[in-house]
Design a protein with these regions (language model features):
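Terminal peptide-recognition signature
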Residues: 50, 92, 180, 188, ...
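Short, aromatic/basic amphipathic alpha-helical patches
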Residues: 212, 238-250
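Acidic, metal-coordinating catalytic cores used for nucleic-acid/nucleotide bond scission
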Residues: 201-205, 230-240, 261
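N-terminal nucleic-acid engagement/recognition segments and initiation subdomains in replication
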Residues: 33, 92, 281-465
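Short, surface-exposed amphipathic charged segments that create phosphate/polyanion-binding patches used
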Residues: 121-124, 210-215, 264-279
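N-terminal structured subdomain of primase-like DNA metabolism proteins
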Residues: 1-75, 82-130, 213, 290-295
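Acidic beta-strand-to-loop metal/phosphate-binding motif
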Residues: 178, 221-235
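Phosphate-handling DNA/RNA-contact segment within nucleic-acid enzymes
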Residues: 5-12, 116-222
Length: 466
């Protein structure tokens, strides 16, 4: 057990008071629900989870719990003549979850200093080569000392991309996932999905794509599909749409993938063992939904992804709320008509079903804003309560309060929405409003107000002004 592993082991047992059962730590005290249901692997702890999956669902990576232990890699793992990359190796294994035996030769351990900008500061780095004279390096020794700068570029990387996979492997795969960061690309490639990293959501990898296209031509192979897979944030989603359209214009078969909302990227999912092929099906769906050109196309994507289990549902598309409805009687008759049509015998069964779905499904807009319930707030003294919602458009977002009366009747919800956000219209009916509100408020977080600066027995805490 390394020095770092011993420190992690000590910290986890101090925090959660685990009992060791075989190769596992169990019966730890969950910080979220207070029950002794916490568990993790004793020898190689990665993720600490609560066993009450439905009632609690607490899950946190060891790197986040013991954040202060993952900062000074050169001190904990000094380089030696036998291993000049000791700190870089340790960082990639412990902070990124990678098997470095599969990365040998793709990185080096270097030093970064900039006496003009950061006097007397130096850090070890993990450096990757993008092209001759072009490098990217990640700071690994207390990077917070350098403010917002956590990495450094050398050379012009415009149009370039980095990949763990060689050119021929990229050409011989069915699809290539395009991420922003190198560690995300490594996570995908080690999970069996060839990928490249653009280094920035503003960098369209034109030179790399040309290399792939030229090599495919030499090999006599069809070009692989490009799947844009940036982070699930505003910058990432904006670039996915932009680069997808550009790739299509450049005659690439293009689509998209997105990690789930919540802030986790591909490397985070890899460390949580959530990047297998079955997991990636959902990620592909999220991406395809994001680039859907019309709400009708988005509705059909959702219907098919759920295997037709729901005939009516609401969904968001381009910051607007829509309602999908499938008339099953009409669908059955239309499918029979298509199957009986001799001019359509060449269609596959799945294509016939898709054609019938297109003819018999209906999508209508029920709100020209995206509505996200945030939390419920209650004042027990005055018996007042409010539901907080985030109201979003492509250009801005704001928070607003709604009462129980507002959210339970279209006649009250519509005027309230219009009064808090200019031009925001609710056009759905009573059933659609109640369906949306019920599904979004049943497990909503609750915030209780405290109006006095005093010790509260209920929460076991002192409340101060500052």
């Amino acid at each position: 057990m390394s020095v770092l592993q011993r420190r992690i082991d000590d910290r986890l047992n101090q925090l959660f008071n685990f009992k060791k059962v075989g190769d596992w730590y169990r019966e730890g005290l969950c910080p979220q629900c207070g029950k002794k249901e916490l568990f993790t692997h004793a020898e190689t702890p990665r993720v600490v989870k609560c066993g009450r999956l439905n009632k609690c669902g607490y899950e946190e990576h060891v790197k986040e719990i013991c954040e202060d232990l993952f900062k000074d890699w050169s001190k904990d793992f000094p380089r030696t003549p036998e291993n000049p990359h000791a700190a870089a190796d340790a960082y990639l294994v412990n902070a990124r979850g990678f098997d470095v035996s599969k990365l040998k030769g793709t990185y080096t351990q270097e030093l970064f200093r900039n006496d003009r900008k950061y006097p007397d500061l130096v850090t070890a780095t993990v450096r990757f080569k993008l092209a001759e004279g072009v490098f990217w390096e990640r700071f690994i020794d207390r990077p917070e000392r350098f403010g917002r700068q956590k990495a450094n570029f050398m050379g012009d990387y415009k149009g370039l991309a980095w990949s763990l996979d060689d050119l021929d492997k990229l050409c011989n795969t069915q699809s290539i996932w395009v991420t922003e960061g190198i560690f995300n690309a490594i996570a995908l490639s080690l999970s069996g999905q060839p990928s490249i990293a653009t280094m920035s959501t503003e960098n369209y990898p034109e030179k790399m794509l040309k290399q792939i296209a030229d090599r495919c031509h030499e090999l006599g192979r069809q070009k692989p599909r490009i799947r844009w897979a940036f982070d699930n944030d505003k910058a990432g989603k904006k670039s996915i749409r932009k680069f997808h359209l550009r790739a299509v214009q450049n005659h690439w078969d293009s689509t998209a993938a997105l990690p789930p909302s919540g802030g986790l990227d591909w490397n985070d999912l890899y460390m949580r063992d959530q990047l297998h092929s079955e997991n990636r099906k959902a990620h592909k769906h999220y991406g395809e939904l994001h680039i859907a050109e019309t709400p009708e196309q988005a509705g059909l994507l959702i219907y098919n992804f759920n295997d037709g289990r729901r005939r009516t549902f609401y969904f968001n598309h381009n910051y607007r709320l829509y309602w999908f409805n499938l008339d099953m009687d009409k669908y059955s008759k239309e499918l029979e008509r298509i199957e009986a049509d001799p001019d359509r015998d060449f269609l596959l069964d799945s294509q016939k079903r898709e054609l019938a779905l297109q003819q018999c499904s209906a999508v209508s807009e029920i709100c020209n804003r995206q509505l996200t319930p945030l939390y419920f707030q209650r004042n027990e003294i005055t018996d007042e309560s409010w539901y907080y919602f985030q109201i979003s458009t492509p250009d801005d977002e704001m928070k607003a309060t709604f009462t129980a009366d507002h959210i339970s009747a279209p006649g009250k919800f519509g005027p309230r929405l219009l009064s808090v956000h200019v031009g925001a219209w609710w056009t759905g009916n009573n059933h659609q409003l109640l369906t949306f509100m019920k599904q979004n408020t049943e497990r909503l977080r609750e915030v209780k107000t405290i109006y006095f600066m005093v010790y509260t027995k209920e929460y076991g805490a002192y409340i101060f002004e500052n």
